[in-house]
Amino acid sequence: MEPLLQNISDTARWVAVFRAEESDRPDAVFHDPYARRLAGERGEQIADAIGFSRQNSWSFVARTFLFDNLVMQHVAEGYNTIINLAAGLDTRPYRMALPSALRWVEVDLPGILTYKEHIMAAEKPVCRLESIKLDLADRTQRLALFRQLGKETSKALIITEGLMIYLDALEAAELAENLSEQQSFRRWAFDLVSPALLAMSQKEMGPVLKEANIVFKFAPGEGEDFFRPYGWKPIVSYSKLKTAATLNRLSEEMKAFAAMPEPEGPVRPFPWTGACLFENMNSSQ
């Protein structure tokens, strides 16, 4: 029997399930009317197989909520380009109230973007959407793309939602350095986990992911400061647990954890995950 997860792109189907479930709630904090179609039956099966993620679906809800807010914040600040790396099945260019003049560039592997284009064929994005099919692991292609986009925009926000945990430290450092070389890439938002949460996630979800040769890797001990040598200054980080608590998405047990004081980062010797925003130190703001 084929494994449920066959490649890294299948994780996008898995995550889409949680966006669909949140969207179905009467008190939903965001609405993604396309998520269930995109997840498909396989997405549901994957989510069911990874019980730990089902029990902690609040983390995915909080992440989507936080990234939605970061996008809207930067649009309000006059950012004219959003570049979504490893975009997967993201539908923000269709579901959010974005300016029609906003340029939205999504980059991911050909397979997942072709699948999304097929499902979304009858839908119309609200902004200027460009889909670029490219393997971000290919350094030559990646650099060429970044240089091209860097010349074409003056004020871009980069988002890499759900990507960093799959990189190793060298890959994360190279990506950070490549991005910071483009002065017009003013800010970068991504989610990060602490070493303690990485170990927990590897234990609870690792066996299912391993079938598809997918491994959780990246959780720098120095937290956000890992990125300073590569041109990125931390601005703010939002705890997913604290966010989920304010959204009333936690179980009673998790509410007790959320009520505890959370020590300031960037070094966090406890299970933690959050959405982090960085400023390009090579940019003239």
Regions found by a protein language model. Name each.
Residues 1-83, 87-132, 139-140, 146-148, ...:
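Rossmann-like AdoMet
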Residues 139-142, 166-182:
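A short, conserved alpha-helix within the catalytic core of class I
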Residues 155-170:
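A short SAM/SAH-binding and catalytic strip from SAM-dependent methyltransferases
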Residues 157, 182-195:
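Conserved beta-strand signature within the Rossmann-like core of class I S-adenosyl-L-methionine
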Residues 198-214:
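Short, glycine-/aromatic-enriched active-site segment of Class I SAM-dependent methyltransferases
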Residues 214-239:
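Short alpha-helix
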Residues 235-259:
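Conserved catalytic loop of SAM-dependent methyltransferase domains
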Residues 270-285:
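C-terminal lobe and adjacent flexible extensions of AdoMet/dcAdoMet transferase-like proteins
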